[in-house]
Every structure is written in C-alpha cells, then in structure tokens.
UniProtKB/Swiss-Prot annotation:
Residues 182-191 have a biased composition (Pro residues). Keywords: Metal-binding, Nucleus, Ubl conjugation, Ubl conjugation pathway, Zinc. The gene is ohgt. This is Protein cereblon. Likely a component of a DCX (DDB1-CUL4-X-box) protein ligase complex. May interact with pic/DDB1. Residues 227-453 form the Lon N-terminal domain. Pfam families: Yippee-Mis18. Residues 159-168 have a biased composition (Basic and acidic residues).
C-alpha cells in the first residue's frame, strides 16, 4: 500500500514539475520575443548605411527667406525626452519642456543613422510593456528575466560599434582620396541687412512702458573700500553691460537715498580667484538707472555694471543669494574698487617737439611714424605689437560681419566691449577679467583673433553653432542679458543659424514677453541630451529681417575651439536617455 501511495505522489510531483517547466519555458519565450521585438524595431529604425561625413551641415534660414519669404519648417520634431524633465524643472526656459513624441517617420531619413527615432522605439517598448502586464508577475517579472537589461545594453552598444566602424572607414576613404585637401569649411552666409530697430532689445521694452528713470552715475575712487549690498550672479559681467532683473522692491527701497541710483555689488562664484588669493570673490559694481512695478509684488530694475571689485570672504555679513532667484535676505560686505591701468602706445610717449602736430594729419601720419621709428632704439615689430590702433583695426575687421557699429573709443571701455562681442573661452574670460592692465587685456584679446570657435552644449558637449555666425540684434552687441517673467536672467547670444540636427523643439511658440518685439520665441533643446539651450525667434510682423534667428543661452552653452568639433559627441547621452526611457516606461 505504501509503495502505491509513494508512486502516486511521485507521479503528481512529476506532472507539477512538467507544468512549471512548461510555464517557465512559455514565460522565457515571451521575454525572448519581447526583446526580439525591440531588436527588430531597433534594426528597422537604424539601417546599416555609411555615417554622414564629419563636415559642417547647417540650416540656413536666410536662404529660405530669399526663395519666397516662407518661414523654415521645424528641423526636428521627435526630441529625445529625458524622464527627469518636467514642467517647472527648467525655470530658465520660460515654458514647460514637455513635448509629445512624434509619430511621423518622414524625417527619419534626415537623421544621422546612429540616432534613435523615438517613435519606433516607443512603439516597441509599449508593445512589450502591454504584453508583460497581462502575464503573471507583470513588469517585475520582465525586468527580473535573464539578462534583460544586459541584452538591451548589448543591442545599443553593438549599434555604436557599427557606427564607429563605418565612421572610421568613411574617414579613411576620404583621407585616401584627398590627402592634401583642408578640412571642410562652413558655407558662407549671404549678405543681409538687419531690418529691425536694435534699440528695442537694448531698452528691454518687454518690461513695459511704465519704467521711470533713476538719475545718478557714480564712479567710485580706485582703491577705495565701500560697504554695500551684494548679490551673486551665474554669468560674468564686464563693466558697461546692462543687467535687467526683477526682485522684491523691499530689498532696495530702504537703501536708495532720495533720487540717487543705488550702487550694489554683483559677484561671480564661477570666476575662480588666483591661487594666491583663494578667499576672494570678484565682481562688479552695478547702478540702477530705471525701475518700474511689475504688478505681481515684484519690481523691474535696469542696472549697468560700472567697475570691477574684489571682496574678501571674511568681510561678508550674511548669506549672499543669487540675484536671479528672487533673493529674500540682504547681504552686505566691504568691497574694494580695482584699478584700470593703461599705458599709451610707445611712439606716442616719444616727445617730438613741434613735429608732434603732424601726428594728427592723415596724409602725414605714415611718414611721421616712420620718422619716429628711425629715432628710437625699439624695432618696428615691437612698436606694432603694442599698437592700440592696430588692435582696434583688426577687431573692427573681425566684427564687420556682425553689423556692430557701437565700438567705443575709450581703451578701457573697448577692452571690456571686445570681451563681450568676440566670445572668448571661459579660461580667457577669467584672465581678461582678473588683469588690472588694459594693455595686457588687449593683448590677450588679440591672441584670439585667429581662433575659430564654436558653441558647445554645456551638458553633453555636442556642437550647436559657429561663433562666426554671431550677429547683433541689439545695439549693445551680440551678447546681451535678458530677464524672463519668472525673474531668471539669461545671457543670450544671437546667431543666424545652428548646426543641422543639433536642436529640437519644445512646447509651442509664443509672442508673450518677447525680448525682440515683432518676433515669436520657441524653446529649443539639444538634440542629444534634451536640455534647454536657447530659443528660436521667428518674425510675425512683415518687413523684419532676418526672418529667423536663434538665441543661445549662456548658462547652457560654452565656447570651445573648432578643433574640438565632432558630429558624434552626444552618442553617450543618446544611449543613457534611451535606457532611462525604457526603465521609466516599465515602472
């Protein structure tokens, strides 16, 4: 009897084990089919064809205007979305960064073949998730399957290896065919006149017409120490720049004596102090010259940077706050006014007596200069190297295409103005700000005249635009500070065009609070990392030129040399965003 019972129990257990094995086999088969579905969608979306050559490819809105005046179509609709991006997460963008994924495949052929068409990938993921939810264990069982995420990563990196291999083969073929050819250059811009009043952005008319003037422009004595209200700022300001901001009026009203404009300090934590003074903060004094009510309990202010200052951190009383983040606490400190030393040109220091009158006669200037050189022990190259006039002329030639006609004549003001309009690297900006010698500052600027620079995304290092495509939509130059309705201050760089496939769009275009009257703005994102990098401005009024241009946010881009350019810089971030998107859809 016992033997019969044992055999019965064993047969039942064997049947149960067979059922479990069959279920596991079906479950594993479903997981394999789901992963195969992703792989098939991936392979369908990413055909095996040569990568595009590493050359500058630009969209040119000016050419479109010339062909009929129609506005250009959106370059990219299917922006790679970051699951951390949500409304309000980017106060700098003025709008929500959420935008629906594109279901249109019409632009897939226009994308680089190593990028991820989001609509196809999402459809595969949605199918896989919907199937997993109907099975025992749901999404958790799918994620805990054998090497599921490892297989997805392997799929991604196999495509990356193929992209790298085809890219190297293409580069080798091009090098073998044309070994002596120089690297490809960007297509030249057609000549265009600015059909826009550049005084309007400089007046910051988006604040409204109810601002009142605050008289008083006070330059403080060099080397003097003053006790004043201080703030922090995420951009480096140079004397002469306008800083618009929106803040609680109680921060200033008690400190504003009568009708005299208030002077306060703005320091820059990004500006690293010299190694011998690690406990110093550098900044500028700013003076308010206009104010007006915003109607929301805040006050609009316009201020102008006047002089460089240095702050000893031990003298700060309170906790300094960023001026762009609606500070609520006052912070005071002692500040010291830094000097600006300028030595005249070597030949102008030579006393030529009565012959000096020939210096100002245009027809005699060259002869007079040659005569001066013959009477000095300095070689002509040394005199030319430190010639203020030669630096001004070379800067004028370099900025000729940017339609700027407001170059100051004072050497001190000119040195700061050139830093803002020539777009130096962060290292060079630091050096030019910290030096007290105007001559040294001009020499540093001169050393960058031959450099070709680009705008790179600060988050993923992908290329966005050429600095040679900068132009002035404001009388203050190509770089201007603007304030959005939330009080966030943007350092905006205006360019004619951006590199093709470098950006996507978010949200809907709007004309509200436009920094350029007559233009609508539309948020643009980096195509690779989906971070906010600026705005597209498109004319909504007739007879405005250019019809389309772009404003790059200084907090989202950096300046780098053209030698850093690579059309594949953002690949790592594409992979990261894809894996994050899969994980978020499965939760």
């Amino acid at each position: 009897m016992d033997e019969e019972e044992n055999s019965e129990i064993n047969s039942v257990q064997a049947r149960n084990e067979d059922v479990q094995l069959e279920d596991q086999s079906q479950s594993q088969g479903l997981q394999d089919r789901q992963v195969d579905a992703i792989e098939q969608a991936w392979n369908d979306a990413m055909p095996d064809e040569p990568s595009p050559p590493a050359e500058y490819a630009f969209q040119d809105p000016l050419a479109i205007v010339g062909e009929g005046g129609d506005a250009p179509e959106a370059m990219v609709e299917d922006v790679l979305q970051d699951d951390t991006v949500s409304e309000g997460s980017h106060p700098s963008s003025d709008m929500s960064l959420e935008s629906p994924g594109s279901e249109d495949d019409s632009d897939v052929q226009g994308l680089p073949n190593w990028m991820i068409p989001q609509n196809r990938l999402r459809s595969a993921v949605d199918m896989m998730v919907s199937q997993a939810r109907n099975r025992d264990g749901g999404i958790a069982a799918l994620l805990s399957g054998d090497n599921f995420l490892q297989r997805v990563r392997s799929m991604v990196f196999s495509q990356e290896r193929r992209r790298s291999r085809t890219s190297e083969e293409t580069s080798q073929e091009e090098a073998a065919e044309e070994p002596d050819d120089p690297p490809p250059q960007q297509p030249p811009l057609p000549p265009i006149d600015i059909g826009f009043d550049t005084n309007l952005p400089a007046e910051h008319s988006y604040f409204g017409n109810h601002l009142s003037r605050v008289p008083g422009v006070d330059y403080l004595e060099v080397g003097s120490v003053h006790h004043m209200l201080i703030f922090l700022h995420h951009h480096i300001l140079f004397p002469g720049e306008v800083l618009p901001f929106m803040i609680d009026g109680q921060m200033f009203d008690d400190d504003m004596p009568g009708l005299d404009g208030l002077i306060f300090g703005v320091s820059f934590p990004r500006l690293q102090p010299p190694e011998d003074n690690p406990h110093k903060l550098y900044g500028v004094t700013c003076q308010i010259y206009e104010r007006g009510e915003s109607g929301r309990g805040l006050v609009f202010y316009k201020s102008r940077a006047l002089q460089r200052i240095v702050i000893n951190c031990d003298d700060i009383k309170g906790s300094p706050q960023y001026i762009a983040r609606n500070p609520t606490n006052k912070c005071f400190s002692k500040v010291k006014i830094l000097p600006e030393y300028f030595l005249p040109e070597p030949l102008q220091s030579v006393d030529m007596g009565s012959m000096a009158r020939f210096r100002d006669i245009p027809s005699m200037r060259d002869k007079y200069r040659r005569f001066q050189l013959s009477t000095t022990t300095w070689p002509s190259d040394a005199c030319q190297e430190y010639s203020f006039a030669s630096i001004v002329e070379r800067a004028r030639q370099r900025l000729e295409s940017q339609k700027i006609d407001t170059m100051p004549k004072c050497p001190i003001q000119l040195s700061f103005w050139l830093v803002r309009n020539l777009h130096l690297t962060e290292k060079m900006m630091r050096l030019t700000f910290l030096t007290d010698s105007v001559n040294t500052r001009l020499q540093l600027i001169k050393s960058t005249f031959k450099d070709e620079t680009l705008f790179f995304c600060r988050y993923c290092n992908s290329s966005l635009a050429l600095c040679s495509d900068l132009f002035a939509m404001s009388k203050h130059g190509v770089q201007t500070q603007y304030c959005n309705p939330e009080g966030y201050i943007h350092e905006t760089n205006t360019v004619y065009r951006v590199i093709s496939h470098a950006i996507g769009y978010s949200g809907e275009p709007s004309t509200k609070f436009s920094w350029f009257p007559g233009y609508q703005w539309h948020i643009i994102l980096c195509k690779f990392c989906a971070q906010h990098v600026g705005w597209e401005f498109k004319a909504v009024l007739p007879n405005l030129t250019p019809n389309v241009f772009f404003g790059l946010s200084g907090s989202s881009v950096r300046i780098g040399k053209a030698s850093e350019y690579s059309p594949f810089n953002g690949t790592t971030y594409v992979v990261r965003n894809m894996l994050r998107m899969i994980s978020s859809d499965m939760e």
